[in-house]
Design a protein with these regions (language model features):
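Covalent nucleotidyltransferase core used to form phosphodiester bonds in nucleic acids
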Residues: 69-77
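Short hydrophobic beta-strand that contains or immediately precedes a catalytic carboxylate
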Residues: 55-57
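Long, contiguous domain-sized segments
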Residues: 1-48, 52, 66-69, 94-315
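Short beta-strand scaffold segments in enzyme catalytic cores
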Residues: 83-87
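Short acidic, Gly/Ser-rich segments with clustered Asp/Glu that frequently serve as metal-coordination loops
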Residues: 60-65
Length: 315
């Protein structure tokens, strides 16, 4: 009988875990076709060379202040929040920031839609209204604004013919070179018979492509981006996905391309607290985007002083 082992999570605790598990990954409730690419489930080593230009996409969001709107006992909860999205383009040995954009939103629940005047020339909030009133519903709407911004940027760069690697699950359903990069695992899409292939991957190898998704059909695969001795079995393994609209042969080409090149972008523990899955271009971009949001305390003071000075127009 194998001896039990203990691992210390490589990620810093404030980011949760790279594998949200309770004894093992839960199985996805999606209907998965594991034989999209081949019936022989074994590790695949891409036979590629060269370094194609690639754009790495990510976004951030932040609640700047909580708020209420209304009169007497009839008040609607809301928030002021900032979102940002951008890209790092890596071409050969050079990298550059591309199109980093900041948006600021006021989100109010209960159908309330107060029109907010600009608090300053640099801090202007556009309005969103939702029927719900729970704090998580307000936050979800802010996150949707961030996702929309990321999606628009991903679509634009992919339409220009660039290889785009977007942090997180894929939402765009177009036949473009857009790859969703999922760095943490809450569930597995592999059966007990196929999961050992993913866990046994060497750096720069991938599983065969499998298909899933009724509403948003996708091709997906697992790949190991770095060695991870003495860590959880799923550490340093990422899942990637593309829309089925690209077609199987193009998906195979993208899977080989991404699998071959991702290891050179794996971060190191001394530099990033979510290493190695938090890729260096994405981690660099995150830091840039957070800086663009501005100091939270200063932004909150502008909001408070603006509201006190009558920064709200008629509802």
């Amino acid at each position: 009988m194998a001896e039990d082992q203990m691992w210390v999570e490589a990620w810093s605790p404030e980011y949760g875990s790279s594998s949200e598990v309770d004894g093992g990954l839960a199985s996805s409730d999606e209907e998965v076709d594991p034989f999209v690419e081949t019936t022989e489930w074994r590790a695949i080593v891409p036979g590629l060379s060269g370094q194609p230009a690639a754009a790495f996409i990510d976004g951030v969001d932040r609640v700047d202040a909580r708020a209420f709107f209304g009169g007497g006992a009839a008040t609607s909860p809301g928030l002021f929040g900032s979102v940002a999205a951008g890209a790092v383009v890596v071409d050969g040995g050079r990298a550059r920031f591309e199109t980093c954009e900041v948006q600021r939103w006021s989100v109010f629940g209960g159908g309330a839609d107060p029109r907010v005047r600009p608090f300053s020339s640099a801090i202007t909030y556009r309005g969103r209204s939702i029927p719900g009133t729970r704090p998580e519903e307000l936050r979800n709407e802010l996150q949707k604004a961030r996702s929309d911004l990321e999606e628009d940027l991903s679509r634009r760069l992919a339409r220009e013919g660039m290889l785009v690697i977007a942090d997180g699950p894929l939402r765009v359903r177009e036949p473009v070179n857009l790859v969703g990069y999922i760095k943490s695992h809450q569930k597995t899409y592999l059966s007990p018979g196929h999961a050992p292939v993913a866990l046994g991957l060497a750096c720069g190898e991938r599983t065969p492509i499998f298909g899933f998704g009724r509403i948003r059909p996708r091709y997906s695969w697992y790949t190991r981006i770095a060695a991870a001795p003495n860590q959880h079995p799923w550490a340093a393994i990422a899942r990637c996905e593309v829309s089925t609209t690209v077609g199987l042969q193009r998906a195979i080409g993208l899977a080989d391309l991404v699998t071959h090149h991702l290891p050179r972008f794996a971060s190191k523990a001394f530099w990033d607290t979510r290493a190695p899955q938090n890729l260096v271009p994405i981690a660099t971009l995150e830091r840039k985007l957070w800086s663009l949001l501005g100091d939270r305390d200063l932004v909150m003071r502008r909001i408070r002083s603006g509201v006190r000075a009558g920064g709200r127009a008629d509802a």
